[in-house]
Structures are given as structure tokens and as C-alpha cells.
Amino acid sequence: MLPMITGFINYGQQTLRAARYIGQGFMITLSHTNRLPVTIQYPYEKLITSERFRGRIHFEFDKCIACEVCVRVCPIDLPVVDWKLETNIRKKRLLNYSIDFGICIFCGNCVEYCPTNCLSMTEEYEFSTYDRHELNYNQIALGRLPMSVIDDYTIRTILNSPQRING
């Protein structure tokens, strides 16, 4: 009779333990119901990038002194800097500046080490194209500032998306 009673007690303990484990899992599932969705519908919704996001490089032609520090610190020697030495004033004059974003690894070394801060990172990250030669940006294309995701009325960002109603 005693083994039968201990068997019932063990069975009851195992049943309670299983119910507790199922309850814990259910509570975790319920705790996730009040969260916002993580997945976004990309072309129509975009995440707002952080301040330190390393997107397309913005170039200010007037600030550049053609020192070529950006070329020396680039791990793949990417920026192409064409300059001409002005003998009468003994300074370099920048003629052309270009970066091929098909090759760029967006490490940010050129921006970090530029002595005149003529390079900066923007929040633009959409470079899709059918021709790889379109990714070679000259100083005119690098000088254009991109439209901010927050200011673009055609894109619904996470900040202005409708919140879930608890109820």
C-alpha cells in the first residue's frame, strides 16, 4: 500500500511541476503581446537611423585642401583625389574628388581623420542600381545632401506609426 501512495504523490508532484512549466511559458508568451512589432514593411516603412550611422559620404568641395589623408587612411585606397599644384601660391588646388560606393566598406576612417571636416557620413543607405558604374560618385554627387527619413512624407517611420491599442 505504501508504494502505491508514494506513486500517487510522485505523480501529483510531476503533474504540478509540468503545470508550472506550462504556466511559465504561457506567461512569457503573454508578456510579448504588448510589444510593438519588430519587423517593418521596408519600402513603405523605414527605421530611423542613429546619429552615428555610417551611410553615404557627404563631401564639401570648398573645405577640401587636397591633403589626401582620406586616401592614406582608407584600407582599400578608395577615394580618388585629383589636384594641381598652384606654383604662385604654393598650394594644391582640388580638381576632382570621387568615391566608388560599390567598393567602399563604409569604415568611416576618411571622415574621422579628415583635418578640415569636409567629409561626413549621412543617413542614406539605399544604393540599389542595375549598373555598378552608377555607384561611382564624383564631387557633385557627393555634395548633394540626402532627404531625411523623418522629413519624407511618403515613408511611414516608426516614430509616426500608429501605436497598438491595448484592450
UniProtKB/Swiss-Prot annotation:
Coiled-coil region list: none
Binding site for [4Fe-4S] cluster 1: 64, 67, 70, 114
Residues annotated as binding [4Fe-4S] cluster 2: 74, 104, 107, 110
Keywords: 4Fe-4S, Chloroplast, Iron, Iron-sulfur, Membrane, Metal-binding, NAD, NADP, Plastid, Plastoquinone, Quinone, Repeat, Thylakoid, Translocase
Cellular component aspect of the GO annotation: chloroplast thylakoid membrane
Enzyme Commission number, as recorded: 7.1.1.-
Membrane topology, from the record: Peripheral membrane protein
Cofactor requirements of the protein: [4Fe-4S] cluster
Chief location category: plastid
Compartments it resides in: Plastid, Chloroplast thylakoid membrane
Enzymatic class: translocase
Reaction(s) the record says it catalyses: a plastoquinone + NADH + (n+1) H(+)(in) = a plastoquinol + NAD(+) + n H(+)(out); a plastoquinone + NADPH + (n+1) H(+)(in) = a plastoquinol + NADP(+) + n H(+)(out)
4Fe-4S ferredoxin-type domain residues: 55-84, 95-124
Cofactor comment text: Binds 2 [4Fe-4S] clusters per subunit.
Keyword check for 4Fe-4S: yes
Swiss-Prot/TrEMBL GO biological process terms: photosynthesis, light reaction
MF term (GO), any: quinone binding
Entry's family note: Belongs to the complex I 23 kDa subunit family.
Subunit structure: NDH is composed of at least 16 different subunits, 5 of which are encoded in the nucleus.
Function of the molecule: NDH shuttles electrons from NAD(P)H:plastoquinone, via FMN and iron-sulfur (Fe-S) centers, to quinones in the photosynthetic chain and possibly in a chloroplast respiratory chain. The immediate electron acceptor for the enzyme in this species is believed to be plastoquinone. Couples the redox reaction to proton translocation, and thus conserves the redox energy in a proton gradient.
Protein name stated in the entry: NAD(P)H-quinone oxidoreductase subunit I, chloroplastic
Organism: Nasturtium officinale
